[in-house]
């Protein structure tokens, strides 16, 4: 049974029925509608914590979806799952693929920076200061891009950039 038909409460069932009706009435081709249904089912599975099912639905959506914007959203959600599962290399690659489809994704850049910053702290704790500095600089690079796209939206990141001396932009109003 598709996840969208497996709802336990009235509100979820009502929302699903309404979403299905809207999709049917949308003036888009059948392929795009099917891509959206897979995306929606993937999002539902992801929200329920069923990451394997979510990834399957997202992969099917990507096979059908032609819109770069929609593909980027799907890829971003896949990267979030990879990151949650601890597969940081695959998450970084998938975030980059999302950015290649739509460069206006500050949350992808923010999450990439989180991975680089975490790796930098790990290297620092292991006494590998040169490696740590390289990773912190990489985090600063992607975080600077994120802050430029979403000024004021990542105050903790802006603060990190300032306190570590890695801020090379004036985004603080």
From Swiss-Prot:
Compartments, as annotated in UniProt: Cellular thylakoid membrane
TPR repeat placement: 35-68, 72-105, 120-153
Gene Ontology cellular component annotations, sorted alphabetically: plasma membrane-derived thylakoid membrane
Keywords assigned: Membrane, Photosynthesis, Repeat, Thylakoid, TPR repeat
InterPro entries in the cross-refs: PSI_Ycf3_assembly, TPR-like_helical_dom_sf, TPR_rpt
Pfam family, one: TPR_12
UniProt GO BP: photosynthesis
Major subcellular site: membrane
Mode of membrane association: Peripheral membrane protein
Protein family: Belongs to the Ycf3 family.
Function according to Swiss-Prot or TrEMBL: Essential for the assembly of the photosystem I (PSI) complex. May act as a chaperone-like factor to guide the assembly of the PSI subunits.
HAMAP family: Ycf3 (MF_00439)
NCBIfam families found in the cross-reference section: PRK02603.1
Protein known as: Photosystem I assembly protein Ycf3
